[in-house]
Amino acid sequence: MKSILIKIENIIRNEMDKIGGQEIRMATLHPSDNWKKTGGWDAVDVLFKVNSRTEKEYALGQSEEEIVTPIAQEYAPSYRDLPLAIYQIGQKYRDELRAKSGIMRGREFGMKDMYSFHESQDDFDRFYEIVKEAYLSIFKNCGLEVKVTEASGGNFSDKISYEFMVLTDAGEDDILYCLSCTHCANVEVSKEKEGELCPKCGKSKLQRGTAAEVGNVFDLGKKYPKSFEYTVKDKDGNDVHPIVGCYGIGTTRLMGTIAEVFGDEKGLVWPKEVSPFQVHLVRLGVNEKIIESADRLYEDLRKKNIEVLYDDRDLRPGEKFADSDLIGIPFRFVVSDKTVEQNKIEVKKRNSSESVLVSQDDVIKILE
């Protein structure tokens, strides 16, 4: 699980760095004073609240607006310091009444959250679109097809936000989407109903589907800078409140969604981009030639920097194959009496029922 999360986080990190995001580490313990300034201490009902031995009140971080705004206030006092985009990848805590579905909705979960600060609405709008495109690249690189969905801003904003939804029965949201264009809206904010013509293209009737939210982007406006009395000097020397954007991706939920979308009745089917290993090497038999052949293949793969899970257990083939299907690594390489006799390797893709025999010289080419 950890190696999958690391790969997902690195995909995210790569795209955030490309668009100018600066990675930092923000506090997990939030002073209550910060939350009281924004009104969130009493208004947000999912806060885990704790008291120190010195009777100071804190909240476990469920989002970072109350922490990141004072950081920007200290380090970006002028329009020359903007735009500023900072992000972190870490753990969040929410006192959910109905935590369920494992890592899809828990009281502790992984999150990438980025915040951007801008002098003008035009500059924010420009960056907002850049982040949306970066998010599409992230989800594509994770093997997912997402729908950019109009949604409510919830506790964060009174403006329309955008959520990145993946169609799956494991989701908790209902969306209406068009098959002929990119229009998609959460049923909570949609002015149209299922079966009505798409308001964007007018070509198809809107379909209803269940989806999982894997990311979101919000226009927070000037709400948080006003709460903290954060202003910057503009080009004319005037004090103005910066405009803030918020961009989140639930890393553990993203992993769970990938598992739900690509899994089958036998187990998991990890896309190669996030799979914990590229190859599941299964050795069948314990005679010297089989062991030597399997060990040599393992070392050859490792020398090519190919991640390999080597199953050298003394179990029946059926048990090993069942475990292999359950784990869901993209390629299974089998070394057995049959393959050793023919100087070949049996290769099977996890998402295929067919296997082929490939010469040992060519087996690595399959992974290229």
Residues covered by each model-derived region:
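NTP/phosphate- and nucleic-acid-binding module
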Residues: 1-368
